[in-house]
Amino acid sequence: MYNESPIIRRPSTRIYVGDVPIGDGAPIAVQSMTNTRTTDVEATVAQIRALENVGADIVRVSVPTMDAAEAFKVIKQQTKVPLVADIHFDYRIALKVAEYGVDCLRINPGNIGNEERIRSVVECARDKNIPIRIGVNGGSLEKDLMDKYKEPTPQALLESAMRHVDILDRLNFDQFKVSVKASDVFLAVESYRLLAKQIKQPLHLGITEAGGARAGAVKSAVGLGMLLAEGIGDTLRISLAADPVEEIKVGFDILKSLRIRSRGINFIACPSCSRQEFDVIATVNELERRLEDVVTPMDVSIIGCVVNGPGEALVSDIGLTGGNRKSGYYDDGVRQKERFDNEHIVDQLEAKIRAKVASVDARIPTTDITE
């Protein structure tokens, strides 16, 4: 099957966010961010667990106040996934959450303060073996850079990132990753391209403030897809004005489409037409809902007629080709004698998929099947 990604990843150094490896060929980590009030511990913990259930490798939590920092301490104790504390304006909050076991500190160089304050955060991170993400954003560039460039440009984002990379270099601190996010696709893509040529540290990708669920997913897929196809990127976050759980799903779908990292069922399904012998759209929607718990990578083709069905089935782990009253079933590209009753196709196909998943899982020697 033609399912190996031709993408050659950009070489980068290795850091760890908790127990999650970042860079140097590690699987691209998918993360999201909570949108609850951090001081609402119960709601925040519930959302973090929901994100973890759909595969989040890392979760970022905004910590805007000292009260939020105290809440973060409790949240950290009640969750398992590595947590990144998002810090703006007050560097002392970064020092506080470091005491509470944060797995990574995200600071925005445009508003965290002067170099001495950054130095305090860096020394604390070094002492506690905590990595840092330098988060540059086109919407919060330093005033002098806006005066110089008049508007966010790739060169402005690069200069902002590099001045803070230089600070970390002078402090002999190399456990960091960098992001240069923007809401404009071309601005973000070119900024990342420039940065990728300047440093060896891992890059965290994102199109910031991308929009609602549909438009934001499309914008992120276009922008991040361009970078990932060039081998750029070690972690990613899809920024949607939607349920954060959707960010994780979209993130994995982007990686899955590029054959970089697969998680769960990859459905190959026709848009359907008058030739379909069963309701393709309803079948796919129901199977997606039922099989959300599956993490084992698997290609399943569901085609409503014999025009493209056999060809797609040949390169799928499981294939279904629409037929009159009964549809053809393929396993590993081989047509089986068994045929599926079109009226009960969802139940029959779900059973076959789950049986094959169980068979594959039994052969996998590692517990991390997503890598």
Swiss-Prot record:
Principal EC category: oxidoreductase
Record's catalysed reaction(s): (2E)-4-hydroxy-3-methylbut-2-enyl diphosphate + oxidized [flavodoxin] + H2O + 2 H(+) = 2-C-methyl-D-erythritol 2,4-cyclic diphosphate + reduced [flavodoxin]
Domain of life: Bacteria
Entry-linked InterPro entries: Dihydropteroate_synth-like_sf, IspG_bac, IspG_bac-typ, NO2/SO3_Rdtase_4Fe4S_sf
Pathway assigned in UniProt: Isoprenoid biosynthesis; isopentenyl diphosphate biosynthesis via DXP pathway; isopentenyl diphosphate from 1-deoxy-D-xylulose 5-phosphate: step 5/6
Binding annotation for [4Fe-4S] cluster: C270, C273, C305, E312
Cofactor binding: number and manner: Binds 1 [4Fe-4S] cluster.
GO biological process: isopentenyl diphosphate biosynthetic process, methylerythritol 4-phosphate pathway; terpenoid biosynthetic process
One Pfam family this sequence matches: GcpE
Enzyme Commission code(s) on record: 1.17.7.3
Listed cofactors: [4Fe-4S] cluster
GO-annotated molecular function: 4 iron, 4 sulfur cluster binding; 4-hydroxy-3-methylbut-2-en-1-yl diphosphate synthase activity (ferredoxin); 4-hydroxy-3-methylbut-2-enyl-diphosphate synthase activity (flavodoxin); iron ion binding
Keyword list, A-Z: 4Fe-4S, Iron, Iron-sulfur, Isoprene biosynthesis, Metal-binding, Oxidoreductase
Xref: PANTHER family: 4-HYDROXY-3-METHYLBUT-2-EN-1-YL DIPHOSPHATE SYNTHASE (PTHR30454), 4-HYDROXY-3-METHYLBUT-2-EN-1-YL DIPHOSPHATE SYNTHASE (FERREDOXIN), CHLOROPLASTIC (PTHR30454:SF0)
Family membership noted in the UniProt record: Belongs to the IspG family.
Job of this protein: Converts 2C-methyl-D-erythritol 2,4-cyclodiphosphate (ME-2,4cPP) into 1-hydroxy-2-methyl-2-(E)-butenyl 4-diphosphate.
The protein's name: 4-hydroxy-3-methylbut-2-en-1-yl diphosphate synthase (flavodoxin)
Organism: Shewanella loihica (strain ATCC BAA-1088 / PV-4)
Encoding gene (name): ispG
